[in-house]
Amino acid sequence: MEVNFFNRKLSKSLSIEKLFSFIIPEIDKLGYDTKIINNPYDLNILGVIKSILFFRSKKATINHITGDIHWLAIFLNPKSTVLTIHDLVGLTQLSGLKRWIFYWFWVYLPIKRLNYITTISEKTKKEIVELLPWAEHKITVIENCLTFSAKKVEKIPHEITQILIVGTRVNKNIETTFSAIKDLPVELTIVGELNRKQLKYLKDHNIRFKNKINISEEELQQIYFESDILCFPSLYEGFGLPILEAQASEVAVITSNISPTKEVAGKGAILVNPLDKNEIKKSIELLMNDAEFKKSLINSGLENIKNYSPQMIAKKYSELYKKMMK
């Protein structure tokens, strides 16, 4: 069976492409003939028209839109096309005409058109169903997979506890983490570009930190291995991949007691109210002072990531493709 994966135009943000680069080889092993096809055109009126014609000429037995270019679904066969929706954050971040365009061409019309939709979490599915109750029967939840290999590492004890923050956008809620740790003997490693306000807070409160931007996958993995705690009290996630990356790296995890992060983390994290700095602080102190508890939490994380292997996720997509062909 041929499966063509339709990707957005390549850009600096490669999170979707990275995810499917782990899943697709496992789908190949299940006997599928796969191709990855990237959109060569820009997102403007002429570019969209060219994109539609381009992808219509690349149709296979199964066409899988991997995300972002949701509008393409409107112009493809509804029975042989599946769309993966990662989140609906555009509905909360956009306003006016942009929000109207996003709703109709990224949400309503693609979902109305297709028979098959996947989401990466129950939360994203729930958000869609709240907007479009009639779409529930179309949606299958297939989670993201872990995108680097777990490996046993010899952790070298640090004189100062190393706390990792991954992502600096508003939804990552890193200011609450800053407030929670400002009086603790810790050092932060922050992955992502900091704005002026964030930098000022760190410097005004004499918080020890390192800032890493534009790093490679190998560098990111090394940062995880050198960290003691991932602090991830996010306010909104489509999934929450850093949780799994930390668990695979034997890093203790603190994350939000909201969906989908609490489901993704399983039993391998301390769940906190993301807006309660004192709760976050107490959780960090617990991990700093109770080595046995920390070890138990890390072991639970290593068990949890077994549910998110590329092989497991590929099998779920295979089951969906077979259903589409009936």
Range-by-range predicted roles:
Residues L97-I117:
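Membrane-proximal helix-turn-helix segments that form the acceptor-binding/catalytic region
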Residues K123, C145:
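Carbohydrate-associated surface elements
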Residues I156-K172, F178-I181:
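Conserved donor-binding/catalytic core segment of Leloir-type glycosyltransferases
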Residues G192, Q198-Q221:
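Nucleotide-activated donor-binding/catalytic signature segment of Leloir-type glycosyltransferases, i.e.
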Residues Q222-S227:
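Short alpha-helical donor nucleotide-sugar binding micro-motif in glycosyltransferases
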Residues L235:
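Aromatic "clamp/platform" in nucleotide-sugar-dependent glycosyltransferases that forms part
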Residues I243, V251-T255:
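Short hydrophobic beta-strand element within catalytic cores of glycosyltransferases
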Residues I270-K277, E285-E292:
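Conserved acidic donor-binding segment of nucleotide-sugar-dependent glycosyltransferases
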